[in-house]
Amino acid sequence: ILLMSHHGELPKLDAAIFSDTGWEREATYLRLDYLRSIVSIPIITVSGGNVREDMREAQVRGLKKDGVRWANMPFYTRDRSTGNLGMLRRQCTREYKIEPIRKELRLMLGLVPRQRAPQGAVEQWVGISVDEAHRVWARSPDRMSTIRYPLIDMTTMTRNDCLRWLERKGYPIPPKSACIGCPFHSNREWSDLNEAEFLDAVDFDEMIRNKGGMKGDIFIHRSCVPLAEVDLRN
């Protein structure tokens, strides 16, 4: 979307906002630097904290360093008594992605704390393609934003269409933007991590295993097997 706007194939954006979880892949940060070097549209980085370090402080169910509750990642669970598998509810996207962007939008509008935002004051674009239409929000997360999906309602582009567009324009294919230890990684995505990132994820996986007074063990791989032991060739 950013590059299509840069090329004039979509309306000109006022700004792009990247919400940094503090635990992104090195390739993601390199891509961000690259984009800043080639487009005139401002790219603003915001942050709601470091999701990995907050997790270390909270140990799954406790409090972060600032005394605030930690937002769960969607870890997989295995009950020690029954062996039943489950999954924790995801809260991290709202706390580390949606909320920091909302706060930045309020700053851009010049709003002070507790000042009511005008309804529909911001048009916010989200890069969801046609084949990911199931991810479209049923409603805007707040009254000040009108959410648009340019790849769906301004053009009709699938993820492969986006990749072909980048190739036609001579741009390198970007990495998938996700936390290093995101439980939604496929085996291919776990394999694509560089060595340092994978070892970091293994360390994190061991750290969360049986913390927080839960009845079960916690894992970041969907198999509920320690990441270090998973056969990622499947």
PLM region spans:
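Nucleotide-activated chemistry modules centered on ATP-dependent adenylation/adenylyltransferase
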Residues: I1-N234
